[in-house]
UniProtKB/Swiss-Prot annotation:
It comes from Pyrococcus furiosus (strain ATCC 43587 / DSM 3638 / JCM 8422 / Vc1). This is Large ribosomal subunit protein eL14. Gene3D superfamilies: 2.30.30.30. Pfam families: KOW. It comes from the Archaea. InterPro entries: KOW, Rib_uL2_dom2, Ribosomal_eL14, Ribosomal_eL14_arc, Ribosomal_eL14_KOW, Translation_prot_SH3-like_sf. GO terms for biological process: ribosomal large subunit biogenesis; translation. Coiled coil: none annotated. CDD domains: KOW_RPL14.
Length: 83
């Protein structure tokens, strides 16, 4: 299983956003991360428990705390879709 780090693409596995892909933008502590859908899906930037996401092998190169515009540009450059 890939590690949860900044720029990692993940799938939400719990809650009403289950099945949606997100990007990890920041690591808050050992239990929570900041994720975003970057405006490409219905997931807004929010804190999420790491037990509620499943990391995927894909990763994009973004700085910690990147804006949604920076995330969207990095996703387009890497050719990754969150839809």
């Amino acid at each position: 299983m890939p590690a949860i780090d900044v720029g990692r693409i993940a799938v939400v596995i719990a809650g009403r956003r289950a099945g949606q892909k997100v990007v990890v933008v920041d690591i808050i502590d050992k239990n929570f991360v900041l994720v975003t859908g970057a405006g490409l899906n219905k997931v807004k930037r929010r804190r999420m428990n790491i037990k509620h996401i499943e990391p995927l092998p894909q990763k994009i190169d973004i700085p910690r705390g990147a804006s949604d515009e920076e995330v969207r540009a990095a996703l387009e450059k890497a050719g990754i879709s969150l839809a």
